[in-house]
């Protein structure tokens, strides 16, 4: 799933020239979806495909109730220091995810989609807090490994076209990254408050480059993963 950040009444970051983050994220998100549609590996879906407002709750509810193999949230960064520039990648913190898992178990939610094997374990052990927590902790560990490995592929492609603001993966307690049934990451595609990056981010050519870099990384990662799984069977 591709999540173009912000939208509608929520413009996201706005620079001194009036460029709104929501417009950049939507354009890159649509371009990425179009690229992914050309591959049999993917079935891409957008959280929004126009300038509409989609609340964080609605985005999270969709993830809860549907099978989403991976979520990529597209954003553009901002800073009061106009010289700051570059792309970065973020995933959720351990503390935030463990809190989400504990809340799920405590509230006994039943409307969350899980893979069949995990769903069966949870259903059979409804009242076993420790077993459910162990299963979900293990799933989170697997998700985190996937996020870390995929981030390496994306960094490899992004650094060909843009300076990296942070050369390592970053962690943040963000709601969009904290669904317990979906691996996810947030990509900051550059700073709209930086004159040079803002100038590039406005253009179709540069938006295409960003979308293509993410697409190539996703294709390479999932192809390698598929080949690895085939070798191990």
Curated annotation (Swiss-Prot):
Superkingdom as given in the UniProt entry: Bacteria
Reactions catalysed according to its record: Hydrolyzes the link between N-acetylmuramoyl residues and L-amino acid residues in certain cell-wall glycopeptides
Cellular location(s): Secreted
All copies of domain MurNAc-LAA, residue ranges: 1-219
One annotated GO biological process: cell wall organization
GO molecular function: N-acetylmuramoyl-L-alanine amidase activity
EC number: 3.5.1.28
Keywords, comma-separated and alphabetical: Cell wall biogenesis/degradation, Hydrolase, Secreted
InterPro entries cross-referenced by the UniProt entry: MurNAc-LAA_cat, N-acetylmuramoyl_amidase_3
CC terms in the record's Gene Ontology section: extracellular region; outer membrane-bounded periplasmic space
Broad class of enzyme this protein falls into: hydrolase
Protein family according to the UniProt entry: Belongs to the N-acetylmuramoyl-L-alanine amidase 3 family.
Function text: Cell-wall hydrolase involved in septum cleavage during cell division.
Name of this protein: Putative N-acetylmuramoyl-L-alanine amidase
Phylogenetic classification of the source organism: Bacteria, Pseudomonadati, Pseudomonadota, Gammaproteobacteria, Enterobacterales
């Amino acid at each position: 799933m591709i999540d173009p950040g912000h939208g509608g009444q929520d413009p996201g970051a706005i620079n001194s020239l009036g460029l709104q983050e929501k417009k950049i994220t939507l354009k890159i998100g649509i371009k990425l979806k179009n690229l992914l549609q050309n591959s049999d590996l993917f079935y891409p879906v957008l959280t929004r495909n126009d300038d509409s407002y989609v609340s964080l709750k609605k985005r999270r509810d969709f993830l809860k109730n549907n099978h989403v193999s991976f979520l990529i949230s597209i954003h553009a960064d901002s800073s009061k220091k106009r010289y700051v520039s570059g792309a970065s990648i973020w995933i959720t913190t351990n503390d935030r995810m463990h809190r989400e898992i504990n809340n799920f178990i405590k509230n006994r939610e039943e409307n969350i989609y899980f893979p069949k094997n995990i769903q069966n374990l949870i259903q059979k052990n409804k009242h076993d807090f420790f077993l459910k927590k162990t299963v979900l902790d293990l799933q989170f560990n697997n998700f985190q490994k996937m996020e870390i490995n995929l981030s390496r592929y994306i960094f490899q492609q992004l650094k060909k076209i843009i300076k990296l603001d942070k050369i390592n993966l970053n962690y943040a307690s963000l709601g969009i990254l904290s669904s317990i049934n979906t691996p996810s990451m947030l990509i900051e595609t550059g700073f709209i408050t930086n004159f040079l990056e803002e100038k590039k981010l406005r253009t179709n050519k540069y938006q295409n480059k960003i979308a293509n870099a993410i697409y190539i990384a996703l294709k390479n990662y999932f192809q390698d993963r598929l080949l690895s799984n085939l070798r191990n069977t």
